[in-house]
Amino acid sequence: MDATANPKAGQLTIVGSGIASINHMTLQAVACIETADVVCYVVADGATEAFIRKKNENCIDLYPLYSETKERTDTYIQMAEFMLNHVRAGKNVVGVFYGHPGVFVCPTHRAIYIARNEGYRAVMLPGLSAEDCLYADLGIDPSTVGCITYEATDMLVYNRPLNSSSHLVLYQVGIVGKADFKFAYDPKENHHFGKLIDRLELEYGPDHTVVHYIAPIFPTEEPVMERFTIGQLKLKENSDKIATISTFYLPPKAPSAKVSLNREFLRSLNIADSRDPMTPFPWNPTAAPYGEREKKVILELESHVPPPGYRPLKKNSGLAQALEKLSLDTRALAAWKTDRKAYADSVSGLTDDERDALASGKHAQLSGALKEGGVPMNHAQLTFFFIISNL
C-alpha cells in the first residue's frame, strides 16, 4: 500500500541518533523529535537520552524491553509493536535508534513495513553509522575498490563469499554466534571468535592486517584503531580486547590478481586505459601523493579561473530561506505537502522563478533557482564524473 496516498491520522518517523553522543543528531532528526506527539527511543548513552528528553517531554525509553531471559528478536518484535500501537492511536510517533536506524536494526524496518501496509505514513531518516565513522577515522573511501559489509555471525552461518580485492567491514565481531541478550557481555564469552579468525585466515592468510575499530561515543573519547595481523588475533591477550561494539576492517590485498581493467569499455568512454587499478593510498605504499601528474595540476591552480558553466549562489536568496524553513520545521513541510502552490504563494520575498520552483519541488528547478542565471540544473553529471574520476 502507498503510505502517501490518503494516509490515516497516525504516522511514524524513524530517525538515527548517530554514534557520537548528541553531535551526530541531524537537524532534521531534532526537528522531528521536537514536534512529535510521542518519542520512543533506544540510544547508546545517557547524554543523548537527556538531550532527547530535553527536546520533548513525551518520551518513552524502549530499552527496558530487553531481557536476559528472552531472545533479542522477541524484544525487537515488542519494540516495533509498542511504536505501532501509538501510531494506531492517531499519534505522530518518532522512533530514535542509535547509529543509522536502518543499519543492523530490526524493529525499525518491521514497524515501517507494518505501518505502511496498514495505511499509515511511515518514513525512515538516515543517521551516522559505525561504518561512516570508520571511513572517516581510517581514511577509507569505499568507492575506490568496492566494499563488502557483513555481520560476523551471518557471514559464518551462510558462508558468505569474501572478495580480498575489496574493503571488508565486519560488524558484531565481539558477539559471534550470540542470539541472546545480556546487559554486560564478558569478552571471554565470545566462544566462537576463533571460527571467525579461521575463516579470515583461509581467505587472507595469517599475516594480513585487521584493524580493530571502535567509534568514540562521548566527546572525551578517542577512536580505538588497533592494528593486528590475523594470526595475532589468535592470542588471548589480543582477542580479549574485542568488545561488543567492536568492528573489524580488513584492507584489500594489493596487488590483486582478481582485479583487471575492462579496457574495451574504457575505450568506449574515451578514457585512457594505461592506468593500473587504483588501490587505497593508506594501503598502497607505492602510491605517491605528489607524482608528476599531481604536480602539474597543482601548478595549474595559480592560473585557474571559474569555467563558463559555473554559476554562483544568488545573494540574499528568498528561496534558500524558504528551503531552510522546510528543512527545520516539520509543520511548515506538512503545509507545503498539503498544497504546494498555496504555500509557495504565501512566502514573501521570492522571485517568480523561485516561487515556481518551490511550488514544483523538483530538484532541477530548485537547484537552478538558487543559482545566478536561474537555469534548471541536472545533478546527474556530477555523479557521472565522480565515478569516472575513481578509475
Swiss-Prot record:
Clasp domain: annotated segments: 254-373
Positions bearing N-methylphenylalanine: 385-386
Residues the record marks as active site: 72, 76, 98
Binding site for S-adenosyl-L-methionine: 98, 100, 103, 130, 172, 215, 246-247
PTM statement from Swiss-Prot or TrEMBL: CmaMA automethylates at Leu-382, Phe-385, Phe-386, Ile-387 and Ile-388 before being processed by the prolyloligopeptidase ledP which likely forms a peptidyl ester upon removal of the follower propeptide, which then undergoes macrocyclization with the N-terminus of the modified core peptide. Peptide backbone alpha-N-methylations change the physicochemical properties of amide bonds to provide structural constraints and other favorable characteristics including biological membrane permeability to peptides.
Region (Methyltransferase domain): 1-253
N-methylleucine PTM sites in chain numbering: 382
Modified residues (N-methylisoleucine): 387-388
A GO term for molecular function: methyltransferase activity
Keyword Nucleus: no
KW S-adenosyl-L-methionine (keyword) present: yes
Region (Precursor leader): 374-376
Disulfide pattern: none
Family that this chain belongs to: In the N-terminal section; belongs to the precorrin methyltransferase family.
Domain observations: Within the homodimer, the clasp domain wraps around the adjacent subunit to position the core peptide into the other subunit's active site for iterative intermolecular methylation.
Known function: Fusion protein of the methyltransferase cmaM and a type I borosin core peptide; part of the gene cluster that mediates the biosynthesis of a type I borosin, a highly methylated cyclic peptide with potent biological activities. Type I borosins derive from the C-terminus of the fusion protein, and it is the same protein that methylates its own C-terminus using S-adenosyl methionine (SAM). The C-terminus is subsequently cleaved off and macrocyclized by a prolyloligopeptidase to give the final product.
Quaternary structure and interacting proteins, as annotated: Homodimer.
Protein name per the record: Methyltransferase/ribosomally synthesized type I borosin cyclic peptide precursor cmaMA
